[in-house]
Amino acid sequence: MAKVSSIKKNEKRKKLSQSLHNKREKLKNKIYDKNISLEERFSLVMSLAQLSRNSSATRIRNRCELTGRPRGVIRKFGISRNKLRELSGRGLVPGIIKSSW
C-alpha cells in the first residue's frame, strides 16, 4: 500500500490540472502562434511559467485505484498488474478469464 500522502498529492495534482487546463491550453496556443510579436510571446511564456508546476498534466502519476501502487498500472482497468491478476483469477473482472491450452 502506498503512502496516503502520495495518493493525496496526486489527487490534488489531478484537480489542479483539470481546473487550469483551459488556461494552459489558451496560453500554449498563443505562444505557438507565429503572427504574435516576439515580445508578446515572451510575456505569454512568462505568464505560463507563473502557473503552478502541479497544474501540468505531465506531473500526474497513474496509480492503482485499490492500492495506490504507482508502477505497473493497466490503464484500461485503472488497477495494478498484481491486483488485476488477483481479481481476474477469482473471476471478479468481467470479460477476463484465465487462459489454458
Curated annotation (Swiss-Prot):
Region (Disordered) residue spans: 1-24
Organism domain of life: Bacteria
Record keywords: Ribonucleoprotein, Ribosomal protein, RNA-binding, rRNA-binding
Signal peptide: none
Family that this chain belongs to: Belongs to the universal ribosomal protein uS14 family.
PANTHER family documented for this protein: 30S RIBOSOMAL PROTEIN S14, SMALL RIBOSOMAL SUBUNIT PROTEIN US14M
Protein name: Small ribosomal subunit protein uS14
